[in-house]
Amino acid sequence: MAIIYLILLFTAVRGDQICIGYHANNSTEKVDTNLERNVTVTHAKDILEKTHNGKLCKLNGIPPLELGDCSIAGWLLGNPECDRLLSVPEWSYIMEKENPRDGLCYPGSFNDYEELKHLLSSVKHFEKVKILPKDRWTQHTTTGGSRACAVSGNPSFFRNMVWLTKEGSDYPVAKGSYNNTSGEQMLIIWGVHHPIDETEQRTLYQNVGTYVSVGTSTLNKRSTPEIATRPKVNGQGGRMEFSWTLLDMWDTINFESTGNLIAPEYGFKISKRGSSGIMKTEGTLENCETKCQTPLGAINTTLPFHNVHPLTIGECPKYVKSEKLVLATGLRNVPQIESRGLFGAIAGFIEGGWQGMVDGWYGYHHSNDQGSGYAADKESTQKAFDGITNKVNSVIEKMNTQFEAVGKEFGNLERRLENLNKRMEDGFLDVWTYNAELLVLMENERTLDFHDSNVKNLYDKVRMQLRDNVKELGNGCFEFYHKCDDECMNSVKNGTYDYPKYEEESKLNRNEIKGVKLSSMGVYQILAIYATVAGSLSLAIMMAGISFWMCSNGSLQCRICI
């Protein structure tokens, strides 16, 4: 009877409640932190772009220079198969095949070719300027050509160069100069012919022991032809060696030769500089536009990182080798479990989130005689939202020193340098990737701790208002010692709770409940003593009965000695 009375009493005195909690939803988004892996959160943002469209596009409305079957050398020298490239508009980047067919039609080499390609990564337009017209070489033949560069079966030559040979039986010293008054630097290319034997040397130049001299304010280069027997390429045993230089504004370049000079007819004024590059690709230009191009395809994204390809041109995210970079923006997603009550362990004592609270990250659940309901705490939610909104920008700012993997090419004699360069670039990218991943892990840890702290702060804010007018239930909830209607609940939520107004009522109810607890302790003590005595007596009677039965059937002998 006493137990029933206590149950009814405690049911009757259960007061109104208000609980502090946080948002939960059906999200399956997972993030990693320094300490945990695959933490489910309510909201997250993937900051790694993994896709491309597989197309080569215009970059910011400007098409690339599509070389087709021509190489960089074939374009600049003027291979007859590259006539469509004799005049090209501004380009955004250059598309070159891996092994273009039309390069040096007359076999030979191009000195510092890789450096020339690197120069093109900062050039967006050349203006072709005639610097040494053919008709200025009045004492030499300027119609030299070769079947290696044939057009329609007839011998021809590089369109931008002039092959000077003897006029009749004489090859006087050839001299030419050009003063760069264009207002920009100018790319100038020239060449030296290396015959197969002395007979060819005399046939073309009359002189033996010739030289080619080129000079500027910063360049002094003198070359002599190397006569040697070589295997034929494109039907030619001779070779042509091309060189280049950048002629500064107001500087002059001077040519002097007694034979074997391949003179430039045109130079290339660098009329526009900017971020460009050479895309090694077998693809063709498609009808599309982008702000970021890779050899694999265009990237159209606002994300700060990508893992598509290390070589990019345009306004591109930063390249990392990572497979996953996800930033937590929401809270740990721990939906409410009915059997465990309303809460779970986000702030150390709250056991689960509320899917019913959809208009904020943190808030309240109340219950009183007028009903129950959820309400978000707009102030703390807004502050948290403002703090996290700039998280992606913060990550970008911390990673603002982009390591740029530039596509470099190396000659056959520089393979060891190429391997070293590749290792260095791979090392830089590894470090860059590690930094990005570590930064994301740290930011995720901070975000989850930040949310945890905000819930705890909201709980403390309510606790400081209510003080001893409530009882802390230990699960994020407070039970009032006084009646708290909806107006009272709203005052708690907006921070205007009137503690003195309810102080006296709370004090009376608190003392009454304490009295019930004290009286109930006496009842429990009597019940405990009664249960102990009754249990001992029952055990003694049972033992006596067993002993009597065993004595009666002879299983137990009893001797009484006097």
Swiss-Prot record:
A lipid is attached at residues 551, 558, 561 (S-palmitoyl cysteine). Residues 547-562 are cytoplasmic. GO terms for molecular function: host cell surface receptor binding. Residues 16-525 are extracellular. Homotrimer of disulfide-linked HA1-HA2. Major glycoprotein, comprises over 80% of the envelope proteins present in virus particle. Belongs to the influenza viruses hemagglutinin family. This is Hemagglutinin. It comes from Influenza A virus (strain A/Japan/305/1957 H2N2). The lineage of its organism: Viruses, Riboviria, Orthornavirae, Negarnaviricota, Polyploviricotina. The gene is HA.
